[in-house]
Amino acid sequence: MAITYLKRSPKTSSTDDTKTREIVENILKDIEKTKEEGCKELSKKFDKYEGDVIVSKEKIEEIKKNLDQKTKDDIQFSHERVRKFAEAQLKNYGQDFEVELSDGLFAGQKLIPVNTAGCYVPAGRYAHIASAVMSVTTAKVAGVKNIIVCSSPKPGVGVHPSIVYTADLCGADVIMNLGGVQAIAAMTNGLFGNAPADILVGPGNQFVAEAKRLLFGKVGIDLFAGPTEIAVIADETADPEMVAYDLVGQAEHGYNSPAWLFTKSKKIADYVLQRVPELIEDLPDLPRENSGAAWRDYGEVILCDTDEEIAKVSDDYAPEHLEVQTKNLQWYHDRLKNYGSLFIGEETTVAYGDKCSGTNHILPTKGAGTVSYTHLTLPTTSS
């Protein structure tokens, strides 16, 4: 038995952690002293935004009126799927109960929603509409009374109109023109007239993730989410073109987004090694820059001898998103243990789960899938 790296990444997801931690610690200390004014100055510095922080009800109504109907329909479709899945999770995940342990001794469990949830919605390179659906909808279904949304504003515009519409549709009580570490600090400390968040949820870049990590304890967090990850398990029956496309589709999220292929097929591996750079070269400027750096620095192709070896490698990596494109899907379904979200069958791509199949895309990264709850996306979602 042998595991061979046909392409091994020169970097890991922890390469820049020390520098990131130092930057975030300094920002958080500064905001503790400067409060709202410090947040505004950082928003001006990083986002070139100098407008109001709180999105007014009038602005929300204006966006709802002017946003194109196709975008609204797509958002509502995603919201309905995610809401239904969240309701099913709430119903089946845990129930209130009381039990008599001995004569006269009663013990029980009661699920009580937090009062305030702070939902972070990334909008640095792209407006992550789906992140608003995933975080706000789930908090609303859980019964959270006060939901605050923060997202990076654009100069002269504020939060992306589609994110404002989505957050309002899904049940946000307050929407703030604030992104980055300053947004996490503002929600944690109850700035701009809001109650302090009891929990922070939602993905973000390495600085947002580090801010959540440093503030954990003062505030609850969903998980420590780093850059998005994809791993594809493929055998000789897989379509190598589809494998290559799926790897690039996640790598383009950011310059430090790992993309991994685990396979027994040298033919599949060689095809992907040749094809991925070609696909990257055909992308528009920003996605090409992101995916090129991600594949160069974090991409890996690992050749194994057996299915068991592949499963062991996959469980060791515990990828955020894991696709299985093999002839023995059921074996992998039963064998694999560590992942954030599992996508079974070649027609079940990560994009479905990330956008609108219903399962949540706020998932563990950097190996945290070994101790986190997992989701399963079956081929029927592609129909």
Regions found by a protein language model. Give the residues of each.
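Conserved NAD(P)+-binding/catalytic subdomain of aldehyde/semialdehyde dehydrogenases
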Residues: L169-P258
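Conserved small/polar residues in nucleotide/adenosyl-binding loops
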Residues: T374-T381
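Conserved small-residue-rich beta-alpha loop and adjacent elements
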Residues: V99-Y165
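NAD(P)-dependent aldehyde/semialdehyde dehydrogenase
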Residues: S257-Y373
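Short acidic loop-to-helix transition motifs that present clustered carboxylates
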Residues: D103-G104, K154-G158, L178-A186, L329
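Short, ordered loop/turn segments at secondary-structure junctions
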Residues: S152-K154, G180, N205, E236-A238, ...
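N-terminal Rossmann-like NAD(P)+-binding subdomain of aldehyde/semialdehyde dehydrogenases
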Residues: M1-N115
